[in-house]
């Protein structure tokens, strides 16, 4: 009798989890679509929502052309839509990479910056700005930032290896050291830079989607797609890793290879996002942490949910950055920090209150 009740309870629990996951995904997807449409319509030049939808219909050949809407169409397709889509890609990349890092390190407070990817990207961007490099035209700074992110991540991984494997603690400590050196290089570059370059560096480090183009979207989406697919494929293995390294190895998981591929995928995602949007804090920390509290630890559910949640938060932050102050385009990093900082504090206090803090 007890076994029957236990089995029934387990079925009810799984059904409850599935319902919660379904509701969460539905909410995130609908909210993201609504915010994307609002973000496309709102700004210094407001475009009614029905005209935004009609413009998409005209582009798809589902609605007749309207000569009186040429200005609105030009604004939407040359400025608003590229920015909105780039923001969605950046948010999805940061949210997913944060969830992967928290799984790899077994710490819900981990984020992509732990492995030095953000600081490496900042060094690359600062070099291109200070030296006024123009090898790839408008893509020079993003290219240098992306290469810097990958280089810093590779440096952290290989320096932390010992006896053929990289331990979690070694990677964290090596990441701290590499980040410190990167910050020193950034400070030196800002010291020798002229006023214009210094202002560009400061604005880039705050994070912004200003100046987004279809070329930027076209160049970044394949990289982010590859990173997302790699992370989603690894989700089941990351769930096994949560049981512990020894248990994962006994289950047939190559822990060292899983960790290396996870870090490489995270470097791709974060490097691509930071290259075009600058450093945007807290997305990779707060979104996975909140969704884990709602959905549980299963990465098969958590990773795609983190992608949607990250995209939603970036879209909301960019909307606020463009509309809260008239005739100004504020850095996105201001809004993510304003949301992420207090949220992080609340989560930390809740964790300590439940006995999760170190004594």
Protein language model features and the residues they cover:
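Alpha-helical transmembrane segments in inner-membrane proteins
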Residues: 2-359
């Amino acid at each position: 009798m007890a076994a029957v009740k236990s089995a029934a309870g387990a079925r009810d629990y799984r059904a409850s989890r599935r319902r919660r996951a379904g509701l969460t995904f539905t909410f995130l997807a609908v909210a993201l679509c609504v915010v994307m449409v609002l973000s496309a319509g709102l700004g210094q030049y407001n475009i009614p929502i029905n005209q935004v939808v009609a413009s998409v219909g005209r582009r798809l050949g589902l609605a007749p052309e309207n000569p009186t809407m040429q200005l609105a169409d030009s604004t939407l397709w040359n400025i608003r839509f590229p920015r909105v889509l780039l923001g969605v890609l950046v948010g999805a990349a940061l949210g997913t990479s944060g969830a992967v890092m928290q799984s790899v390190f077994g710490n819900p407070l981990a984020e992509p910056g732990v492995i030095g990817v953000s600081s490496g990207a900042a060094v690359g961007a600062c070099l291109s700005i200070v030296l006024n490099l123009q090898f790839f035209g408008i893509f020079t700074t993003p290219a240098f930032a992306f290469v810097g992110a990958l280089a810093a991540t590779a440096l952290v991984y290989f320096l932390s290896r010992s006896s053929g494997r990289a331990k979690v603690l070694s990677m964290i400590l090596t990441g701290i050291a590499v980040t410190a050196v990167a910050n020193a290089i950034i400070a030196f570059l800002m010291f020798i830079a002229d006023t214009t370059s210094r202002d560009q560096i400061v604005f880039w480090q705050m994070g912004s989607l200003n100046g987004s183009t279809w070329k930027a979207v076209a160049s970044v989406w394949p990289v982010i797609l590859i990173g997302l697919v790699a992370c989603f494929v690894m989700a089941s293995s990351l769930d096994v890793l949560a049981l512990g390294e020894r248990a994962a190895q006994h289950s047939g998981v190559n822990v060292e290879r899983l960790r290396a591929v996870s870090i490489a995928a995270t470097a791709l995602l974060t490097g691509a996002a930071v290259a075009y949007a600058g450093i945007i804090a807290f997305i990779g920390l707060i979104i996975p942490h909140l969704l884990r509290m709602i959905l549980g630890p299963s990465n098969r559910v958590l990773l795609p949910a983190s992608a949607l949640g990250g995209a939603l938060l970036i879209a909301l932050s960019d909307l606020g950055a463009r509309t809260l102050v008239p005739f100004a385009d504020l850095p996105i990093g201001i809004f993510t920090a304003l949301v992420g900082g207090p949220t992080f504090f609340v989560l930390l206090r809740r964790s300590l209150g439940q006995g999760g803090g170190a004594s």
